[in-house]
Amino acid sequence: MKSDIEIAQSVALQPITDIVKKVGIDGDDIELYGKYKAKLSFEKMKAVEANEPGKLLLVTAINPTPAGEGKSTMSIGLADALNQMGKKTMLALREPSLGPVMGIKGGAAGGGYAQVLPMEDINLHFTGDMHAITTANNALSALIDNHLQQGNDLGIDPRRIIWKRVLDLNDRALRQVIVGLGSPVNGVPREDGFDITVASEIMAILCLATDLKDLKKRLADIVVAYTYDRKPVYVRDLKVEGALTLILKDAIKPNLVQTIYGTPALIHGGPFANIAHGCNSVLATSTALRLADYTVTEAGFGADLGAEKFLNIKVPNLPKAPDAIVIVATLRALKMHGGVAKSDLAAENCEAVRLGFANLKRHVENMRQFKVPVVVAINEFVADTEAEIATLKALCEEIKVPVELASVWANGAEGGLALAKTVVRVIDQEAADYKRLYSDEDTLEEKVINIVTQIYGGKAVQFGPKAKTQLKQFTEFGWDKLPVCMAKTQYSFSDNPSLLGAPTDFDITIREFVPKTGAGFIVGLTGDVMTMPGLPKVPAAMAMDVAENGTALGLF
């Protein structure tokens, strides 16, 4: 089997102007970034707003292994299969962060024969969205420090600045830094730090904004610091929301590319699901819904993170809720949840599949709480045995959830046809009746307890001293009606990454809340979730190179 990049480079790409015609987009509706990439114009997005939205398919997964379970690959393969069936389909996915690409992943544009192209561009600088977000974020940091230096009219307490700088790389050495050292002309010395760009609130804002006006309003609503008397300081107090919007005026436009099979794909935005809401942009998803009969989108990590946030945070900003949810499961992950060591996952173990099924079962039950039909997709791997597959199918039948084996990595669209047919059948036979898990009127405490007990299966929530104080403060500031975005490990339902399967007798501890008032949610911090990742001992970057003719090498 060829590597992902070898497969990608063997494909004769079609001009993006030809690809977009499939969904009614003309050359005048796009802004080209070379022959194979483009951005969609504001005019076209506005023109299709009155269109009736098509069907929306949300792809999510069980709690993953460190290698991931193939949601992006499955999403791409499913969209290609639907198109092959004659259904006018678009993809709406996140764009990769350079940090994980250079770190552990090596690439994030699907895999095998289910990829979005040109994968080298998508994985590296793409159309510059990440750089624009990084620049806007760091411009705000510079403007805050300049305000301190120029007299500090707002009375900002330098010890209580919560806005950090960002970089689109994994760089643990920058997690905590001191700025303003050297002399009085270098600014006011203070503690600062760097997050990875995809953890920036500006990334979340870009992905939830519905147009430029909404983007500007959300940027103005960002809380950057507190005054000496503990009052919040907003971007609007600094009067720089216009400048930040200007930096982002092109980045807010969704990017158009293609799959190996020529399916049009909107790739836009990429917040992490363990520290943010983990979904691509509202603009991309909404526009795809109005251009195509079927839109396939994904939410990051397991359904306890990305899908929960998609359904509670993103859906209220979309023209409609999902018509079906596809939960991706792999036998290797189920065996890991069933107690098998990583080194033994290749060996057949039907009993471990039975034990690990508890994880998948809870995800199915959780998604059914939202009153949306669920389908299970088994992402096939070479090491899977017929006995293990039969075991998993039988277990799915016991809980009456449709299940299909999909081999899109190895076989592309053909490998996803059975899944696509089942998804279409389920949508035709069972209408979704979307129900949100909580109300905006619930308190922050009630929202957290609801997520922990109803989605994670936890027993109770423990609020640390700082979190308890913040619950009172945030209510006084009027932030208590915002949804909650939990920052939690992706590997477990709990806040302990080693507690696999479907644990029940556990508490979740909220140590702190972080206001993301521009994005429109409050983050609850659990465990030791990092907002600036580090690199592994052997980074993926060590396998990367470029040929003399400029061809990328080693992007997995």
Curated annotation (Swiss-Prot):
Pathway: One-carbon metabolism; tetrahydrofolate interconversion. GO terms for biological process: tetrahydrofolate interconversion. GO terms for molecular function: ATP binding; formate-tetrahydrofolate ligase activity. ATP binds at T65, P66, A67, G68, E69, G70, K71, S72. It catalyses: (6S)-5,6,7,8-tetrahydrofolate + formate + ATP = (6R)-10-formyltetrahydrofolate + ADP + phosphate. It is an enzyme of class 6 (ligase). CDD domains: FTHFS. Its EC number is 6.3.4.3. Keywords: ATP-binding, Ligase, Nucleotide-binding, One-carbon metabolism. It comes from the Bacteria. NCBIfam families: PRK13505.1. Belongs to the formate--tetrahydrofolate ligase family. This is Formate--tetrahydrofolate ligase 1. It comes from Streptococcus pyogenes serotype M28 (strain MGAS6180). The gene is fhs1.
